[in-house]
């Protein structure tokens, strides 16, 4: 086969696309696992301190402080962070979402 500029371009494009797609799928999978892990952690965070009754305010203040600290790290600068910071942010989002779902379950 003759190597023309068009065939070289397409072969480079396909290789570049497949490597980016592979990296994106790995990052997406890790992000979803982190999100679901945060949802699972929030279930534990809402049930364990609720059993004793006296840890509710302390646990809530620690959770809010941790969420605000992660938000400050992630959203303070405009530069792109690595995968670990994104996973930490997904974990935070999962915890927040799980706590809202538990609050709606208790309210209904």
From Swiss-Prot:
It is found in: Plastid, Chloroplast. It holds the Pfam family DUF565. Keywords: Chloroplast, Plastid. Belongs to the ycf20 family. InterPro entries: Uncharacterised_Ycf20 (IPR007572). It comes from the Eukaryota. GO terms for cellular component: chloroplast. This is Uncharacterized protein ycf20.
